[in-house]
Each structure stands twice: as C-alpha cells, then as structure tokens.
Amino acid sequence: MLVHPEAMSVGALADKIRKIENWPQKGILFHDITPVLQSAEYFRLLVDLLVYRYMDQKIDIVAGLDARGFIIGAALAYQLNVGFVPIRKKGKLPFETVSQSYALEYGEAAVEIHTDAVKLGSRVLLVDDLIATGGTMLAGLELIRKLGGEIVEAAAILEFTDLQGGKNIRASGAPLFTLLQNEGCMKG
C-alpha cells in the first residue's frame, strides 16, 4: 500500500538521516541513510516518494549504482513493476560487461554493467543514495547511453550542492531529481 503524497514529509526523511563527523576521514560530515532503511515507516516513505514521481513516466527499467543505489533502486523497480539492473564496481559482474571510468579525489575508479542489461531504446531511471561530485552517477549515465538506453532521469535522496555534482550531471544532458539538497559534507 502506497502512502498518499499529501501525507508525505521530505523534512521527516531529512531528520532521519544520521550525520557522523570525521568519517570516513577527518573533515567530512558523513550523511548515513541506514536509519531510513532500518525503519519500515521511513523506508516506505522514501520509496513511495519516488514511486509517485515515476509511476506515470513509462519507465522500462531502474538501474541502481553500487551499493546503496541497489537498495533503493530494487525496491523502486518492484513498486513500479519493472526490472532492476545493478551497475557494479569493476570486476564484480560475472557476464560480459561494458565499463566506464570516473575520477576520484586521488586516482580513478570504474563501474560496469552487463552488456545485455539495457535494450536499445529502453527508458531508464538511474538511482543512487547521494550526489557529491557526481562522478559515479555520470559514469552510470554513460554506461546506459553506451547500451542505447534513454535516460528518463537520474535520482538520489540527497545532493551536496556545493560539490557541483548535480550541476555536472545536468550539464551532461541528464535530468536530475533529488529529494533533499544540502550545502555539503565538509565540516567547518
């Protein structure tokens, strides 16, 4: 049973996100979504907010980024009655893959998708938990495009606006929706 949109409070969801100072390193204010996931009420609120946004957009498939995007994306795909595609860290998928690298603060990483995961012309919603610099989301968007998918939207719970990730995603031509915006994850 879906929660009616008028009963939904994004502010309540924001209050449930735990902030942890100096993790994973000094100077970072980590935003932990696990309290949202641990609560049946708030997890349902999160998924229902996204379901109401996308239920009439003719989504063919939901793709989720490793790892928290899997949790949100799979639940959303189930409610939308569409399939789910994981976009994993390099070396974690067993079948033929296509890969996309992205920059990290120090170095580079890559994500992969199975070559048969997205059919040509499929309408794809890409989901993750948060947007910081946007590198992972941009790499996921590029993988979907490489396979011929049409990006309906990129979606996340939280965007750190001062890190410019949302701006970078929009500049790539992908629409972006986030439930919450925050000025950043840097302490100080």
Curated annotation (Swiss-Prot):
Gene Ontology CC terms, in alphabetical order: cytoplasm
SUPFAM superfamilies with a match to the protein in the record: PRTase-like
One term of GO molecular function: AMP binding
Top EC class, one word: transferase
Pathway the protein contributes to: Purine metabolism; AMP biosynthesis via salvage pathway; AMP from adenine: step 1/1
Compartments it resides in: Cytoplasm
Entry keyword annotation includes Transferase: yes
Record GO biological process: adenine salvage; AMP salvage; purine ribonucleoside salvage
Reaction(s) catalysed (UniProt annotation): AMP + diphosphate = 5-phospho-alpha-D-ribose 1-diphosphate + adenine
Keywords: Cytoplasm, Glycosyltransferase, Purine salvage, Transferase
EC number: 2.4.2.7
Pfam entry (one): Pribosyltran
PROSITE patterns listed in its UniProt record: PUR_PYR_PR_TRANSFER
Function text: Catalyzes a salvage reaction resulting in the formation of AMP, that is energically less costly than de novo synthesis.
Family designation: Belongs to the purine/pyrimidine phosphoribosyltransferase family.
Subunit structure: Homodimer.
The name this protein goes by in its record: Adenine phosphoribosyltransferase
Species in which this protein is naturally found: Neisseria meningitidis serogroup B (strain ATCC BAA-335 / MC58)
Lineage: Bacteria, Pseudomonadati, Pseudomonadota, Betaproteobacteria, Neisseriales
